[in-house]
């Protein structure tokens, strides 16, 4: 299925049915009272996050979604039927924005999450509601309310634990193939990857994580060059970035250090928050170099990019904040198991820290609420 990560649609809820003006007509009851029922409510339009949907492609072809109107009220106290709602299934990770106001309507982050995009109009009131002591035969009823209508921008950001970052042809697709069941298109030319690919990396029965391979970046990507910033957004929800560098480019004029610095510069220009995400360095294609040349190129690269963190041969107890360096061959799988093992350990620790932080915040909130509650008299006698 073709991956589509942006779409524009229009949604319109149904109008409420009109209330009825009607009077009882029975034998031997010449002056029957009002019996006009209310109109039914108009159908609403909802968005629902669905983990089995992974693209916005259908919203490129069908751009308008109109819910039905509510049924009008009837005599004999019969209310009009409400119209059915429309539910639009969207991928988890879809951001929905109102095109007219710029408001973020919804951020679909988990399976089954539902958000109302356009609310159906209320049904009108029948004349049964307007009977009074001075007006025994009211002819008044009200029309149904109009339903809401919106023009919306849908934007899909893939949800992944780890994002692969790098220039075209750095070997990102080969890496995700080596460590997961994902099978992206791979060839020896830039921009092989034309849309994000997701792969599930399984460590054991109880541990796995999701890795995202986005199209390669080039200098100027933050301004839209190449495949542009439309793919940088997919990295914003990841918890860890792997900066993959081709240490043995076929083109001898290519400088890996300059390319790596260009990528870092693009991140900084695009989004400071994205630039500040934990980012590990992965030097790829060691299978193309002998041991001595690999050592020399690695040393030259690290000096050129100003790497002042632990080197490959250092014995160092990594913490959560320290960037890490890996030397691998995605093609031969050299070093990939150590890489995914450390990623898994990092993500486990990250989730533990986040859970502890959330629990502490909940406890602090509960204390604050308790302190704001009025103190009640316990009924205990206290002598003056």
Curated annotation (Swiss-Prot):
Residues bound to Mg(2+): 173, 193
Intracellular or extracellular location(s): Cytoplasm
Compositional bias annotation for Gly residues: 33-43
Cofactor section: Mg(2+)
GO BP terms in the entry: ribosome biogenesis
Any one annotated GO CC term: cytoplasm
Keywords of the record: Cytoplasm, GTP-binding, Hydrolase, Magnesium, Metal-binding, Nucleotide-binding
Listed PROSITE patterns: G_OBG, GTP1_OBG, OBG
Superkingdom of origin: Bacteria
Entries under InterPro entries matching the protein: G_OBG, GTP-bd, GTP-bd_Obg/CgtA, GTP1-OBG_CS, GTP1_OBG_dom, GTP1_OBG_dom_sf, OBG_GTPase, P-loop_NTPase
Keyword Flavoprotein: no
Keyword Transport attributed: no
SUPFAM superfamilies: Obg GTP-binding protein N-terminal domain, P-loop containing nucleoside triphosphate hydrolases
Stored Pfam families: GTP1_OBG, MMR_HSR1
EC number: 3.6.5.-
Coarse class of the protein's main subcellular location: cytoplasm
Domain Obg: start-end pairs: 1-159
EC main group: hydrolase
Record-listed GTP binding positions: 166-173, 191-195, 213-216, 284-287, 329-331
GO molecular function: GTP binding; GTPase activity; magnesium ion binding
Region (Disordered): 20-46, 364-384
HAMAP family: GTPase_Obg
Function: An essential GTPase which binds GTP, GDP and possibly (p)ppGpp with moderate affinity, with high nucleotide exchange rates and a fairly low GTP hydrolysis rate. Plays a role in control of the cell cycle, stress response, ribosome biogenesis and in those bacteria that undergo differentiation, in morphogenesis control.
Family: Belongs to the TRAFAC class OBG-HflX-like GTPase superfamily. OBG GTPase family.
Subunit annotation: Monomer.
Protein name: GTPase Obg
Biological source species: Neisseria meningitidis serogroup A / serotype 4A (strain DSM 15465 / Z2491)
